[in-house]
């Protein structure tokens, strides 16, 4: 494997300080070297277990510590999840992400999670989960079930992290990413813009991600969605150009990673989203629901794609791509359901 130089904080800071149009030009050049600039990967996220999370993440309406009006729900039945995955595939998604509001999954739930992964894979979709902290054995079980991606965000820089979360250390997050990688699962990890962090903190976040032994295959960049009842509900709005800069720097630093427009896209007008795609974003969560916050409606996404000449990327799951794939092919029931979130994001 060719040696990959490590980034320094001063190098990343210099990128953030570049004139915006110069930065966008560089990011677009990098993007075109590694991706078809007209292709956008489309994912759908389903909250398979909502609310009552014991963590204290100050941005999150799912924390049991804040009164946000969110009604807690138990882990969904496997067939309910698979019904949602079918609809997601029919709507054009190629990756189905399942998120649970936990500090970590309980052993009693692992068999259900494995069945969910196996069922999603059998449909020809990529499977992704975000379940909190994992043990080595849990990561391996999910890998054996066929899980393609595991999402576990770093959220912000190590220096600012303690201002946002105290119930889980930064090192615990890094340890989970290492366990996921060691199990053979692709890593999805990014952060949030708008927590009250400085530009240096944004640089520090991207530095951590890019300097991992292997950078994440997927890097979600979220804009804070301010939810009444959370400690960050009154934070200042994020300047659109600052967000676009973050996308561009992420693209330059991690040229082969998918950079995803995630939470907060509902707050962006078409022009801002277009500039994010120009800056190198090439993945979105699609549809009407972003876990517990709104996301642009599907038809609006498709209209924007048409205006910009973008196309949803075809599924990356190929025959034989996963050792479990042939074993996972099985007849699946296809009842209709309305209990489904056709979009997403962490």
Swiss-Prot record:
GO terms for biological process: biotin biosynthetic process. The keyword ATP-binding does not apply. [4Fe-4S] cluster binds at residues 53, 57, 60. The keyword Zinc-finger does not apply. GO terms for molecular function: 2 iron, 2 sulfur cluster binding; 4 iron, 4 sulfur cluster binding; biotin synthase activity; iron ion binding. InterPro entries: Aldolase_TIM, BATS_dom, Biotin_synth/BioAB, Biotin_synthase, Elp3/MiaA/NifB-like_rSAM, rSAM. Keywords: 2Fe-2S, 4Fe-4S, Biotin biosynthesis, Iron, Iron-sulfur, Metal-binding, S-adenosyl-L-methionine, Transferase. This is Biotin synthase. It comes from Escherichia coli O157:H7. The gene is bioB.
